[in-house]
Each structure stands twice: as C-alpha cells, then as structure tokens.
Amino acid sequence: MPVRPAILPGTPFSRQLGPDQARTLLKALADPIRLQVIEALGGGERCVCELTEELGLAQSKLSFHLKVLREAGLLADRQSGRWIYYRLQPEALEQLRGWLAELAASCTAPATPCC
C-alpha cells in the first residue's frame, strides 16, 4: 500500500495541514537521529555516503531514517548513477511552521464563558 505524503506539494502553508498530517511530521521529527539528518540537509542536497560519514551511522540505519522522513514529506530524493541524493522539502517545513504559528496565535484567545 503506497504511503501518502504528509505534505502535498504546492499547497498553501497550513491550509492542507490537518491534525493527522501535523502528527506525522512531528512524529518524524521526534527522533534525535532524524533531527540530525534534517540539520545536516539544512546546508543543501547531500549524498547518502556523505550523510553516513558525517553522522557516523551505518548505511542501513541511515536509510531507515531517511525513509521515514521521505514518507512524511520532509525530504525528496533523486538518483544519479549509483548515488542517491536527499534534500529538504521546504514546503513541508513551511506548512508545519504555519500550523504551529496558527496554534500559537490561538493560545492567546480568551476563554469563552461556560455554563
């Protein structure tokens, strides 16, 4: 069964980001290794071999984490010969940022009277 990415390319920031999609993104980002991968890719597209060396991870372990991030919609990849290059999907990060900003803005709203 194909995995639906959390973020649909080209959608306005948080309009397409519902609770399920936000949960998928936050879950993908909750792992310390995946955060290291995201930070490493903040400088631009990288080959898997570069990431394994920089992060000190076995290729199989890194591949698992890259798959989780890609399926969440946070990464894109391309193959060039026998190498696979990964890059961040800025749209996903912007949508998550927008969703968090809306959530933060709603925190300041006063409570409605009850009873």
Place the predicted regions along the sequence by residue.
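N-terminal helix-turn-helix DNA-binding core of bacterial DNA-binding proteins
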Residues: 20-60, 80-93
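Alpha-helical residues within the helix-turn-helix
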Residues: 53, 64, 70-71
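Short acidic/polar alpha-helix capping motifs at helix-coil junctions
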Residues: 11-15, 47-48, 62
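Short, structured secondary-structure boundary patches
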Residues: 25, 72, 82-84, 98-102
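Amphipathic alpha-helical dimerization/coiled-coil segments
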Residues: 1-21, 90-115
